[in-house]
Amino acid sequence: MSWSVEKKREIISTFGRNVKDTGSTEVQVALLTERIDHLKHHFLKHKKDHHSRRGLLKMVAHRRRLLKYLKENNMLHYTNLIRNLGLRH
């Protein structure tokens, strides 16, 4: 599965406030979650790809910070987002 423009548009339309909303916290978390899932499948085949693993860890940390920000500022959006994405928090 490649990271396509159509997939990005689909995520933005699902989690964004409008079509051009790419900067909201919800959209950023959803996009990061999609990239993290893509890399998880990559590591099933390429176990020794440590360079990409470091990038994965950075993405997970960034997503965690964004979720913390969202939880502190808008609990309703936070709970809806983690329910829709299937995250454990």
Curated annotation (Swiss-Prot):
Gene Ontology process terms (BP): translation
InterPro entries: Ribosomal_uS15 (IPR000589), Ribosomal_uS15_bac-type (IPR005290), uS15_NS1_RNA-bd_sf (IPR009068)
GO terms of molecular function: rRNA binding; structural constituent of ribosome
Keywords: Ribonucleoprotein, Ribosomal protein, RNA-binding, rRNA-binding
GO cellular component entries: cytosolic small ribosomal subunit
Keyword Nucleotide-binding in annotation: no
SUPFAM superfamilies assigned: S15/NS1 RNA-binding domain
Transmembrane recorded as keyword: no
HAMAP family the UniProt entry points to: Ribosomal_uS15_B
Family: Belongs to the universal ribosomal protein uS15 family.
Subunit field text: Part of the 30S ribosomal subunit. Forms a bridge to the 50S subunit in the 70S ribosome, contacting the 23S rRNA.
Name the UniProt record assigns to this protein: Small ribosomal subunit protein uS15
Protein species of origin: Blochmanniella pennsylvanica (strain BPEN)
Chain's gene name: rpsO
